[in-house]
Amino acid sequence: WFSDTFEVGTSGQINTQWQPCFTAHGDKTEYESMVKTFAAATIGFMKKKPNVDSIRICQNDVIAGENDVANCTCDACLAAYAHYGNTIAGAMLTFTNDVADKVNEYLDSDQAIADGFSSNKELNIVVLAYGTASKAPVLRNAIGDIVFDEAGKGQPADLYRFIKDDTGAIRSVLQKKENGENEKLTCHKRVTVEYANTTANYVRSFYEVENQLYANAVKSWAGLGGKIYVWLYQVNYHMYFYPYNSFESLVENLRFFKTYNASYVYNQGTFENPNCGGFAKLREYLGSKFEFNCNYNYGEVVDFWFKNYFAEAEPYMRQYFNELQANQRAKESKTGGGIHSNALAGEDIWPQGMINHWVKLFDKAYKAIEHYKETDPEKYEILYKNILIESQFPRLVLCTTYASTYNATQLKVLRKE
């Protein structure tokens, strides 16, 4: 039930051979066995962890240090991939629907009641629309463009299964309803789609032209009838400690996805380090507010955060934030907005004079809270740490880009401050 091909990367064999084959290589008997096995495993997991409400079906992501999300390349998977517009999502959704049908059959049974489940149990079997599955398997015209309905959503395509015949050749078989109509590929009961795209520009919103391709993918998935989950990205993962200007776009993206009935959002940020600079804490706060109510006023929320997070140091920290954003916008043609980029550093992006100016702003910020040392030491420590976290980025630039302008003692001080 896995791909029988592989590629060789810089670290040796990589994970194409370990990608799941969602068609069972076109073998009808093996496919039925695969569906039964996965459905039984899902039901078994549900019994062990009855409070879990979502189970994901996805491709493998990163194995042996290689970022390889290629799909299975057997003849059946390649046929499905080509048929649905260069996406493996058609095969994935078909398989997920078949699994869900069997899980639903169990949940509607007397046995499920005896096991302590009701027929309306909350359970989402989630197709991860990621990698080569990010494009929806929807109706397209002769040149491959998506055909949207009047509401601007994708329209379901006819359902085909890709089955090996007696000669071993793969045949595409159109599925028919009992009334003779073509069956459509839609999300069955309890099937949910989670959209996750790592190639979008997350310093821009999905309303903007830079992300039109990805916005259209979301609109396409929204037409297939299932819930929409969203996995968003909020940092450049190749340059983790550099600022990523996704504050306003984060809010606009939440509003965009809400328009298409998204019910769950995971904003992946600096999860490996809880104390990154670049105003990661502000981004987390924005998520905590706007994920529950997209109608807040962005400016008012940002103002509230700065006043309460930095107290008397707010004017200096807000000036730093505003200038940081202005510089990022001005240099966006050089840095881009990708989350896997090495273009964020350099003297042309961060002039030394500007960095030194920001360091002086931090000195003023520390001085503004100095009086709390005596009057409220606990508050002082909190505010001091909040400022210190944000000071990491300009000091990082001085210690790396401009390291040659300091002696060893000075660099040691910068790194330890």
Predicted features and spans:
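Structured mid-domain segments that build the active-site/substrate or prosthetic-cofactor binding neighborhood
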Residues: 30-34, 44-47, 195, 201, ...
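Polar/charged alpha-helical tracts
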Residues: 4, 9, 16, 32-36, ...
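Catalytic domains of carbohydrate-active enzymes that cleave complex glycans
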Residues: 261, 287-417
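Short flexible/disordered coil segments
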Residues: 127-149, 154-158, 225-238, 252-260, ...
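Alpha-helix boundary/capping detector
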Residues: 64, 247, 283, 331-332
